[in-house]
Amino acid sequence: MVIPDTPTNRWNRRPRGRVAAVMTEQVQSPEDVQFWFDPLCPWAWITSRWMLEVEKVRPVRADWRMMSLAYLNLIQHEGNGQSPEYMERMSRAWGPIRVVAAAAGHSGPGVLEPLYTAIGTRFHVQGRREDPAVIPEALAETGLPASLAAAADSTDYDQVIKDSHNEAFDDVGLDVGTPVIRIRGHAIFGPVVTPTPRGEAAGRLWDGVALVTETDGFFELKRSRDRKPSFD
């Protein structure tokens, strides 16, 4: 017997009660994952692009947050074991994250991802890390006031950056860098990967990372990197 495809019968085939509520909740309530970044780091950039891919194939939503490589290396690690050239680069690393913090103060945390994308595309994909035009261009692209660029040379938002940074590193420890992600209350460094996994490959990596992160007593998986960051 074939049941006619009428509006009444379509309604009768819909999930009811608790089943319908659960299905609706699953569709409408993606899992929040905290992602700490410094726009200067090429490895964090690649991982952030992976995170955006994960959002397309898994019920996950990134909550973008700030950390500072300058604060980590110059203050918390006191520059130990770093070359003078690296220390000089770190001293300049304050600028971009200060602008990001000022933008969040101006427009709210929702601006973090688009501004990070605008800055990171220029820094990493276009290879313009030393170009002073990057910050003004990124602010213009995201519809933010050009005046926010002045925050690069101001300490007004340093405490905001440090507070966000410390939230991550109080959980994950000081012997790591960026990115830091927190999944279901468990913070880890990484994953460090290149090039960016896309589509279902991104989803499978997410599944594995989420699984090991929830394992009691899990601390580390690591091997030496044998290739440079790829921004394809």
For each of these PLM feature ranges, what is it?
Residues W45-I135, G208-V212, E220-R223, P229-D232:
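Structural alpha/beta surface segment adjacent to cysteine/selenocysteine redox centers
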Residues Q26-V27, V180:
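Short glycine/proline-enriched loop/turn "hinge" motifs that connect secondary-structure elements
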Residues M1-V22:
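N-terminal amphipathic/basic-hydrophobic helices that include classical n-h-c signal peptides
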Residues W36-D38, R122, V193:
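Short strand-loop junctions, especially beta-strand C-caps/beta-turns
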Residues V27-M51:
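Local sequence-structure signature of Cys/Sec-based thiol-disulfide redox active-site neighborhoods
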